[in-house]
């Protein structure tokens, strides 16, 4: 009996304590809400994509910290809200909803895979918030609430193919990719582009492998066989994530040198190379809009800040990090111009905003919510960095609707009033997608 | 000033072209250029664009000067620098933040200067090819047979008719039969590309077809459409070579299959003990493999830091450690969680799956989500050719290692008191207990053994796989597949199952593609299990039936 009483007493006490704590916390967060502008970070910190996305969370935290040191935004401090969608695509949508409706963030920086982006699109539309998406993707999309700071196919894939053709004299193409939406769409565009350039269908080989594929012996030997038809052959790789490391190892093992069959990759950056001995890979290529090896004072500053932030002299920077750098600065500038973090005002103010990128130019936000970027082609070096061998003379604006695909070549996107349409068909004169 | 220099250099290149052409025609034995001439040509390498650099390389090669090969070699390796202010081209060797400089012409050491004052001369693949061809032509008469062979191979790739005089000179001097053959093949390739007589070309086709490999196929295919005899001969030769290649391909598929099978065997063999012998559905098995791979990483890290000389032995040191670490974690899991769940397979499955997530995240928090670099010791890098099959050392060692682990485990279970007790507990727990066997202790040790074996599998897999927290996930399904297919509780079944699946996969892959191939294998296993639920080699016995 007495023990029962103790328990009841304890429970009441605990309850009262919890109530008080909750009250305090609510008050505290109410207070904080008045003082800070919240920025949501939606990157996987666990699961398969953690390998790529963790650094993006860190770079956002660093950028926010730097902005706060400069005095914050609109006289308020920025506050990062980090959530972990755990590489689980539906969870991205839930976490996005949590960020926007519960935490009241002004903008969200996040997503990596296209499928995660597709899963959060309806949430951003419904709750009218702003998403900055920092990764190269397949195009064929333009949403009012999304700002695409990574490359569209015309800012990466097509210039890379042009380079190989002009500089290396490639006539035979292997399009190798991981089996999901980004490689499949990119390869469809590339195939149409190559056929339009007069490449014979038998000179194109398309190959897909599952995520995390690790036994590349057969495919690499197939590539070798395909490459012995007397024409210069190259591999265009949209292989994503972990699978790249064993792929490159196998290339090295089977003695395929870059001078014989070069591989140009769209998803391999400094971060991915950090896990391999790159000596056998020297000369293989990657196309990006930024490399750590870009020689520019702003880039040097950024790399130094990043190394200091990570506390590691070996920390590397890569293209999606630059995309976040550009996106974050664009958002800051647009908020300052609009004088508010209100989504509608910021979305309008973002179009036309120009900020310095890390390769010595200014990137600006186009009316189609894609940005202008230089296209760089780099060759892998033995220290895991890229030597830039080609750079477009000017900046290229992302083209969301590919000109080489049936059904998307007539579409344009312009989010400025009065058109305000993401898929305007110039032939039918109607907003509403593919004809 | 610098503009005039550029102009002058360009002029010198053009002139040298002409002069060198004459020289090549008139006197095959190359004359030595003066230092000043050579210096101008070398400085021209630091041109603005790749095409200009290519011209400069060709001009340098035309001099035939024996100092040129070293300069071009340095350029190919990225060791050639140009001073930011002096515009002088030098050979540099990085030493910390400084460069140790050598004069490219006189080979004299110039001194050490900060690397910031110099820019590396960039090369791309096209230039690398040009450099190799140039060095090839220059070193055909080298004293070193390895260099001569490499030179002949490089010249072969150029198929440049202008190399024929140089090749003829080299063929006349050559004594080594192997290198002589490569040189003759290189000459044949050049002849095919020249405007030689038809009979010469047909002979050249025969020479090249003699190689019977992909390189020859790649050359011959280009002449199929040639008019007259040449086209006919080329077509016949291509057909011949294709037949040879098809045969080798079958052999290659078997080798690839054995190699994949050995990887599957390594991954599954620990599970064959924990799941096969003990009946525990251990979803954290893959994480034991992952922990073994991380142990290798840590061992290599320590070796790099404290004893770089021992690097070649890093895997041998990592093996026992990985066994102990993974085994100890296995014992802890068995004592801490699994022993409370015996006889409740669903709960065991969920609990071990939870443990696998915990282990993954723990590794991710400690080491980061990025891949860790695990190096290959020198005896595991590279490959050698058997006919047209290139066998990589790492795969070969993994096959050997998998077989070794298999037989060691077999011996342990069949020939030692511990093995006897384990089998007794598996066969009939009550009776074993009544005979005085400490069954809980045997449970813990057997689980530890299975986990430890998974750990050493991780050491081997670290050589061909990404060492990341997700390493194990990729293997868990495959491992269960192998064990179930081979027959639960039977190590031989695991061996046969792994090799069958490996080879089947590799024969399907060229036709069906990697994605479909895997699906076919899965469908096959599902059908097979319907027919024979106990797998290939079913154990018979009273307790098993119960």
Language-model features and meaning:
Chain A
Residues 27-29:
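N-terminal signal peptide c-region/cleavage motif recognized by signal peptidases
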Residues 250-325, 335-341, 392-423, 427-428:
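Extracellular/periplasmic periplasmic-binding protein-like sensory domains
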Residues 51-58, 66, 71-140, 149, ...:
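Beta-alpha junction/loop-to-helix N-cap segments that form part of ligand/metal-binding clefts
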Residues 37, 354-435:
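Solvent-exposed, acidic/polar segments of extracytosolic/periplasmic ligand-binding ectodomains
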Residues 99-111, 132-134, 172-177, 230-241, ...:
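Periplasmic-binding protein-like
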Residues 94, 138-139, 145-254, 293-301, ...:
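Extracellular/periplasmic Venus flytrap/periplasmic-binding protein
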């Amino acid at each position: 009996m007495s023990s029962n009483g103790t328990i009841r007493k304890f429970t009441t006490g605990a309850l009262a304590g919890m109530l008080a704590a909750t009250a305090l916390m609510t008050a505290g967060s109410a207070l904080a809400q008045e003082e800070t502008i919240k920025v949501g970070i939606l990157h996987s910190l666990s699961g398969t994509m953690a390998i790529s996305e963790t650094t993006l969370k860190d770079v956002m935290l660093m950028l926010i910290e730097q902005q706060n040191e400069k005095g914050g935004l609109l006289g308020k401090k920025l506050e990062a809200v980090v959530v972990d969608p755990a590489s689980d695509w539906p969870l991205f949508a839930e976490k996005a909803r949590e960020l926007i409706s519960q935490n009241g963030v002004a903008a969200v920086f996040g997503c990596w895979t296209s499928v995660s982006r597709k899963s959060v699109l309806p949430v951003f539309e419904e709750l009218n918030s702003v998403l900055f998406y920092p990764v190269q993707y397949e195009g064929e999309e333009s949403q009012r609430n999304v700002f695409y700071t990574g490359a569209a196919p015309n800012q990466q894939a097509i210039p890379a193919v042009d380079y190989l053709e002009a500089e290396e004299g490639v006539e035979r193409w292997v399009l190798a990719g991981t089996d999901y939406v980004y490689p499949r769409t990119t390869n469809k565009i590339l195939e149409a582009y190559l056929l339009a350039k007069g490449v014979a269908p038998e000179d194109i080989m398309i190959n897909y492998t599952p995520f995390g594929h690790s036994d590349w012996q057969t495919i690499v030997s197939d590539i070798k066989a395909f490459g012995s038809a007397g024409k210069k052959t190259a591999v265009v790789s949209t292989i994503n994530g972990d699978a790249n490391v064993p792929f490159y190892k196998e290339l090295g093992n089977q003695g395929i040198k870059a001078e014989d069959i070069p591989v140009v990759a769209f998803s391999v950056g400094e971060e991915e190379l950090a896990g391999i001995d790159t000596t056998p890979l020297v000369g293989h290529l990657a196309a990006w809009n930024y490399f750590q090896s870009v020689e520019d004072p702003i880039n040097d500053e950024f790399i130094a800040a990043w190394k200091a932030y990570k506390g590691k002299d070996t920390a590397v920077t890569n293209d999606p990090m630059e995309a976040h750098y550009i996106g974050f600065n664009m958002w800051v500038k647009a908020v300052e111009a609009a004088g508010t973090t209100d989504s509608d005002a910021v979305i309008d103010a973002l179009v036309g905003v120009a900020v310095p990128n890390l390769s010595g130019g200014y990137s600006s936000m186009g009316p189609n919510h894609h940005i202008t970027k230089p296209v760089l082609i780099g060759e892998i070096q033995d220290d895991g960095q890229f030597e830039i061998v080609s750079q477009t003379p000017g900046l290229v604006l992302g083209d969301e609707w590919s000109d080489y695909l049936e059904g998307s070549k007539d579409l344009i996107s312009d989010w400025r009033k009065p058109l305000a349409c993401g898929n305007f068909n110039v032939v039918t004169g109607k907003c509403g997608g593919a004809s | 000033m610098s503009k005039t220099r550029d102009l002058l250099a360009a002029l010198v290149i053009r002139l040298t072209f002409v002069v060198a052409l004459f020289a090549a025609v008139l006197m095959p034995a190359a004359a030595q250029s003066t230092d000043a001439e050579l210096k101008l040509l070398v400085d021209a390498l630091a041109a603005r664009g790749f095409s200009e650099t290519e011209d400069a390389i060709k001009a340098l090669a035309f001099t035939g000067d024996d100092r040129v090969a070293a300069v071009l070699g340095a350029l190919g390796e990225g060791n050639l620098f140009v001073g930011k202010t002096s515009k002088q081209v030098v050979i540099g060797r990085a030493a910390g933040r400084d460069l140790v400089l050598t004069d490219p012409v006189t080979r004299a050491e110039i001194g050490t200067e900060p690397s910031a004052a110099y820019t590396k001369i960039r090369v791309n693949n096209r230039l690398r090819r040009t450099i190799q061809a140039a060095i090839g032509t220059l070193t055909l008469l080298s004293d070193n047979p390895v260099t001569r062979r490499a030179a002949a191979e490089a010249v072969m790739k150029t198929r440049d008719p202008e190399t024929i005089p140089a090749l003829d000179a080299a063929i006349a001097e050559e004594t080594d039969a192997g290198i002589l053959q490569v040189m003759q093949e290189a000459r044949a390739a050049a002849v095919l590309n020249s405007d030689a007589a038809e009979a010469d070309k047909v002979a050249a086709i025969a020479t090249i077809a003699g190689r019977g490999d992909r390189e020859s196929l790649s050359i011959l295919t280009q002449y199929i459409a040639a008019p007259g005899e040449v086209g006919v001969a080329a077509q016949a030769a291509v057909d011949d070579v294709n037949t040879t290649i098809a045969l080798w391909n079958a052999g290659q598929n078997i080798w690839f299959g054995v190699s994949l099978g050995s990887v599957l065997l390594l991954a599954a063999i620990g599970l064959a003990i924990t799941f096969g012998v003990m009946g525990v559905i251990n979803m954290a098995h893959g994480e034991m493999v992952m922990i073994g791979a991380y142990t290798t990483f840590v061992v290599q890290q320590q070796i790099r830091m404290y004893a770089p000389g021992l690097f070649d032995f890093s895997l041998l040191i990592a093996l026992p450690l990985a066994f102990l670490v993974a085994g100890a974690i296995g014992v802890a899991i068995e004592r801490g969680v699994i022993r409370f769940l015996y006889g409740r397979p669903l709960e065991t499955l969920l609990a071990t799956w939870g443990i696998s997530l915990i282990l993954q995240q723990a590794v991710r928090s400690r080491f980061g989500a990025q891949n860790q670099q695990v190096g290959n010791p020198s005896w595991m890098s590279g490959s050698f050719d058997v006919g047209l099959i290139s066998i990589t050392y790492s795969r070969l060692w993994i096959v050997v290692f998998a077989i070794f682990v298999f037989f060691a485990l077999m011996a342990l279970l069949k020939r030692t008191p511990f093995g006897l007790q384990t089998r007794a507990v598996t066969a009939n727990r009550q009776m074993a207990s009544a005979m005085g066997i400490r069954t809980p202790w045997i449970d813990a040790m057997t689980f530890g053994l299975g986990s430890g074996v998974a750990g050493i599998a991780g050491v081997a897999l670290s050589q061909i796989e990404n060492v990341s927290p997700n390493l194990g996930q990729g293997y868990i399904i495959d491992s269960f597949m192998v064990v179930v297919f081979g027959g639960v509780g039977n190590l031989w079944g695991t061996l046969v199952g792994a090799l069958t699946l490996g080879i089947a996969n590799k024969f399907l892959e060229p036709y069906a593609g990697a994605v479909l191939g895997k699906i076919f294998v899965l469908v096959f296993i599902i059908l097979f299990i319907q027919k024979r639920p106990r797998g290939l080699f079913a154990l018979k016995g009273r307790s098993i039936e119960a």
